Each structure stands twice: as structure tokens, then as C-alpha cells.
Amino acid sequence: MCSGESGVRVAPDGEDADRMGEALVELLRALALMVVADGEGARRIGRVVARGGNPATLEIAARAVANSPLVKTALHGGDPNWGRIAQAAGGALPGTAPLALDIDIEGIAVCRAGAAVAYDEPALAAAVRGEEVEYELGLPGAGAETEVFFADLSHDYVSLNAEYTT
């Protein structure tokens, strides 16, 4: 594919290029998930999907949620603590007051415009106990989207990293 030795030529414009691009994105996404799942002591995988109008802002918010130790430990414990998600995203976006943030966890709305909404707590608690949990962030605007994958922060992770020296 890279060397050109196969003799296959794909025109940059057209259906073949589109199909090849889609297949490549699917392959790279699967590889990224494998890397995350192979993390030290990882038990669960989180996926943050952020949608809104500013791609840079979405990336900042999604990465802040994915990198938050509190969100990672909530994921590990199967805790649908959406306040940790709001804190991580809001803390990464200073000057957005109050943060016009919508949050869904596993498709269940828990926060709209920065405020709690009524939801089925037992259904949400059951939904976050799976091996993969999706967190959706909605920020002002439309048209852009980003996704970030992350692993939970487990007791095993702490033990593995505390037991060796460099």
C-alpha cells in the first residue's frame, strides 16, 4: 500500500478514494482502541464525544475530561458522577460562564445548559458498569465533533506504577 509496488492506483477524487479513506479511519480507530485497552491495569474504556462549533474548544474539553483522574476513577468504579465531567470540561474552558454544557452518559441526558436534569438513576448506574462507557459533551455551536478514548484509573495501575523505580 505504501510502496506502490502493488500497482494499484486510487484516484484522489472518487468513490474508491472515499472507501479507502473510510477503511483507513476504521482501522486506525480500532488500533487506537487496542492501545487504550492495553493500558497498565486497564479494566474499562471511556469514549468522550464532544460536539459544538469550535473544533479547538471541543478538543480541549474532551481531553480535559479524558485526562481527569476523577473521571478515570469514576469510570473504574462504575460511578456515573457527571459533576466530575462538568468540572473537568469547565475547568479547561475558563471564561465560559456559566458553562453552557450538555452531558449525556451512555445516551442518557444528565445535564443541560450546565444544570442537572431528571434521569433514571438505576438505568444510568447499570449503563456505566459495562466495559466501555460513552460520555457526550455538547458545547455551543454546531458542525464540529471530536472523540477521545481513555482508560480507567484502577488499583492495578497505581500498584504497577508504584512498584518499580527507574
Q: Where are the model-predicted features located?
A:
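A structural signal for small-residue-enriched, beta-sheet-centric alpha/beta enzyme cores
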Residues: M1-T166
